[in-house]
Every structure is written in structure tokens, then in C-alpha cells.
């Protein structure tokens, strides 16, 4: 009757549940439903599914969360004329912090101050020094004395004054400002809100969703999987965001309709032994998570000598698939970054093989060809066959080392980084309905110890 949270592993039908909830809610003649998710890419994929369901377009709005924020802030003139920082990283904010430090003496550098501001002050919505003095700093490893906090708050005031002068606002800060405006003026623009992939949101974003709809029957419907949290550092707690999803307000889906049991087992082994927060004070578990399709081929993982051999192995696997009457359009080749796909793209072009590059909301190439994308872009998609490149300890580490990228992280940040890499590989593997192939060169990823890797020689 009120807020509902539906969680579950990959392929359990969470998004399908959200889509049918949308169709049901739009049967109300007064419906004005918001369907939102974290990325533009997911919104585009969902749009196709909504169209197939025949949901009346005048009854709902479909947008990613940032677009919803900007449209809402513009409509109600919140921070009108301000530029939003941090859509492409934190460099703009760090530059402002460096300006603050040019005239101030402090033991803290710009990165620490930026993180403290975003992860504590903005995250918890601290409005003044008194609130910040009393604020528990969950997840921050460096303890601060009262004197240090007072000093930090003075720097924050200078930082905010500089932003005011430049007419810029931090992205998450704009979420808080807009949320406060809606709550203070008792404005709730939507009759219902549906949010897919809730694990990708942060607390300021969840508070914003809470403010978009009045509390009541069918107000919020949230779907997601805490284990698929692939965006490092995005902390979330429903209770702290004012969203009650405890007890009967939560449901967990456990039957995987997409992947075979052998694929599911390997995917689960990647995240096994790691504590994943259920985002409401408990721990997320994969217990009882089973595949409807019990039989299937186990994922293959092979280590080769170099990048050329890696590309050659992918070509061989593709040939096997085509010989088994699998279409090119049913295959996706993915890597941790687009840079790792350059040689693969060149080989496909040289061989005259049709392909399509998926990058953000753009799809460039032949729709009947094999898809190329990053692991992150695989989110929300599914294929008959998934081929993963660049699978080694460097790109998908199982433990922290003394070098890059761990050298600049504290223990908490290292743990979060490693968890996000596990989640990323879990997401990538579970996009496949039938076959998973993984290849890399160098040291094998320790995340895949459960899979027997074979050294291949193409000489």
C-alpha cells in the first residue's frame, strides 16, 4: 500500500516487475508516474520495453535521475542560472578547493576536503557547523577532533562562497537544494515514482525521489540488486533517506530466468565471501538464488600471451558460435574499457565482420552485427553469448597491491574499489543467456579461481 522494494539477483525479473507496475499505475485516469533509473543508456533500453507494453505516453515520464533533477530544478527555479559541477568527474570541484587552499593554511589537501564535503556534509545534508560537529562520519577512516572539524567548516564556508561567486553548484548539492525546496513548499510533482537499479543511486538522490511523491498508497516502487553496485563510493541507506522498506515492504526474487545454472554459479563465485550491504542495515545474500535453466555449458576462461593472441581467441570463439547457428547480433564483446577494444574493432573491420559500438546512448555501426561495449555499458542488456576481454588481475583485481590504483587509497576505499570490480564482473557474466567466454593476458584474475584457465599458444 505504501513504498515497496523488490530486490533479487541478475535475471530474476526486477525490471519486468517495475514495467508491469508502471502499466498498472497508468490505468489510473489521474496518473502522472515517473519511471527513472541512473543512466541514460538504461532509460533508452527501458523505453523500448514500455512501448511494447502499450503504456499511454501521456501518463508517465521516463528519464534518468540527472535529467529529472535538472528539469525539476529548472521548473521551480532552484539555483537558476547556475552551472552544475561534476558531471564528468571531480576536477572542477578540486580546482575550486585548490583556490581555497591558496589563501588558507591547513593540514588537509583538496582531495580530502572534497571527499569530506561530498561524503559527509552533502551526503547527510549538514546545513551548519552545529550539525557537522554532531555528525557521525560513517565510512571515513581518519578520525577528526572538534578543533579539526571547526577548521574544516570554515574552509567549507569559503568554498561555498567561491561557488556562489562563480554561480556553480555541486551535483549532489543541487539534489539536496531541490529536495529541500519541494519539501518546504509541500510540492510533490508525481502521483507515483518507480526507480529501477536502486543500488546505483546515492542518498541525496534517494531523498530527492522521496520528495517527488507524497507518502501514500503506491508512492514509491524500487527495484535493484545490491550486489550489482558497480559505481564505487555511492553510499546508500534507505532509512537515512526517509524511505521505509522494512518488513512487508520488501520482497526478494530468487529465480533466475536468464542465465543457465553453470553461468550463475561462476557469477556468484565472483562475489562470494564479500559482505554486501542490503542498504537498510543488513547484509545481502545469494542464498536461494537459483536458475530456472539447470543445464548448460560452463563459462570458459583462457589466458594467452599478448593482445594479438587475445583478439585471435575471440575470433575463434565467434567462428564456433556462427557455426552453431548463433547470429552476430546475439553476441556481445565487452572489455573493462573502450581502449581495450580498439584492436578487436580493427580486426573486425579488417575481416569485414559487421559490428556495432555501444557507447553511452550512442549506437554506431550495423544493428545486425556483433556489439562492442564496456562492462559498464552491459548493464541492463542481455545476449545469447557474451565474450569478455581484458580479464586479468590488473583490470579485475582480487586484492590490493602497493601500486596503482591502490597507493592513493585508504583501507576503506580499497575495499570499496575491490567490491565494485567484483560486482562489475558479476554484472558482465550474468548478461549471457547461454554462453560466456573470458580471455586475457598477463596474470589471471584471482576473482575467477573457480574457473579453470588454459594457456593457449597461437604461434
What are these regions (language model features)?
Residues 145-152, 202:
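Ser/Thr-centered flexible coil motifs
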Residues 78-148:
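ATP-hydrolysis module of ASCE/P-loop NTPase motor domains
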Residues 4-34, 40-82, 154-168, 183-356, ...:
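Conserved helicase motor core of SF1/SF2 NTP-dependent helicases
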Residues 5-10, 129-135, 166-176:
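Short coil/turn segments at secondary-structure boundaries
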Amino acid at each position: 500500500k505504501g513504498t515497496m522494494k523488490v530486490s533479487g539477483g541478475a535475471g530474476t525479473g526486477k525490471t519486468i516487475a517495475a514495467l508491469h507496475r508502471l502499466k498498472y499505475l497508468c490505468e489510473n485516469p489521474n496518473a502522472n508516474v515517473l519511471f527513472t533509473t541512473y543512466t541514460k543508456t538504461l532509460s533508452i533500453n527501458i523505453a523500448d520495453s514500455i512501448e511494447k507494453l502499450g503504456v499511454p505516453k501521456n501518463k508517465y515520464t521516463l528519464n534518468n535521475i540527472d535529467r529529472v533533477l535538472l528539469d525539476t530544478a529548472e521548473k521551480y527555479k532552484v539555483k537558476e542560472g547556475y552551472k552544475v559541477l561534476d558531471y564528468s568527474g571531480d576536477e572542477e570541484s578540486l580546482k575550486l578547493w585548490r583556490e581555497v587552499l591558496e589563501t588558507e593554511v591547513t593540514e588537509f589537501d583538496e582531495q580530502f576536503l572534497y571527499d569530506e564535503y561530498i561524503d559527509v556534509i552533502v551526503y547527510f545534508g549538514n546545513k551548519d557547523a552545529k550539525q557537522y560537529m554532531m555528525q557521525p562520519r560513517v565510512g571515513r577512516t581518519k578520525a577528526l577532533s572538534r578543533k579539526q572539524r571547526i577548521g574544516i567548516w570554515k574552509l567549507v564556508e569559503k568554498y561555498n562562497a567561491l561557488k556562489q561567486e562563480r554561480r556553480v553548484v555541486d551535483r549532489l548539492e543541487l539534489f539536496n537544494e531541490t529536495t529541500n525546496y519541494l519539501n518546504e513548499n509541500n510540492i510533490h510533482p508525481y502521483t507515483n515514482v518507480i526507480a529501477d537499479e536502486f543500488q546505483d543511486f546515492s542518498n541525496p538522490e534517494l531523498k530527492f525521489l522521496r520528495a517527488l511523491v507524497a507518502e501514500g498508497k503506491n508512492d514509491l516502487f524500487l527495484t535493484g540488486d545490491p550486489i550489482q553496485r558497480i559505481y564505487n563510493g555511492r553510499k546508500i541507506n534507505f532509512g537515512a533517506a526517509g524511505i521505509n522498506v522494512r518488513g512487508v515492504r520488501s520482497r526478494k526474487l530468487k529465480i533466475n530466468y536468464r542465465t543457465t545454472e553453470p553461468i550463475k554459479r561462476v557469477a556468484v563465485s565472483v562475489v562470494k565471501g564479500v559482505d554486501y550491504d542490503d542498504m537498510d542495515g543488513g547484509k545481502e545474500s545469494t542464498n536461494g538464488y537459483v536458475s530456472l535453466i539447470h543445464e548448460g555449458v560452463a563459462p570458459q576462461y583462457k589466458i594467452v600471451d599478448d593482445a594479438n593472441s587475445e583478439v585471435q581467441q575471440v575470433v575463434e570463439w565467434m567462428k564456433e558460435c556462427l557455426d552453431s547457428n548463433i547470429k552476430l547480433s546475439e553476441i556481445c564483446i565487452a572489455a573493462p574499457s573502450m581502449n581495450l577494444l580498439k584492436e578487436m574493432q580493427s580486426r573486425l573491420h579488417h575481416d569485414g565482420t559487421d559490428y556495432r559500438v555501444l557507447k553511452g546512448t550512442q549506437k554506431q555501426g550495423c544493428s545486425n552485427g556483433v556489439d562492442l561495449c564496456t562492462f559498464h555499458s552491459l548493464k541492463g542488456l542481455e545476449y545469447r553469448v557474451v565474450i569478455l576481454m581484458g580479464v586479468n588481475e590488473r583490470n579485475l583485481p582480487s586484492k590490493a597491491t602497493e601500486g596503482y590504483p591502490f597507493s592513493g587509497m585508504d583501507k576503506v576505499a580499497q575495499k570499496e574499489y575491490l567490491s565494485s570490480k567484483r560486482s562489475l564482473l558479476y554484472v558482465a557474466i550474468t548478461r549471457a543467456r547461454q554462453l560466456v567466454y573470458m580471455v586475457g593476458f598477463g596474470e589471471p584474475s584471482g576473482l575467477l579461481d573457480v574457473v579453470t584457465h588454459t594457456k593457449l599458444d597461437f604461434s
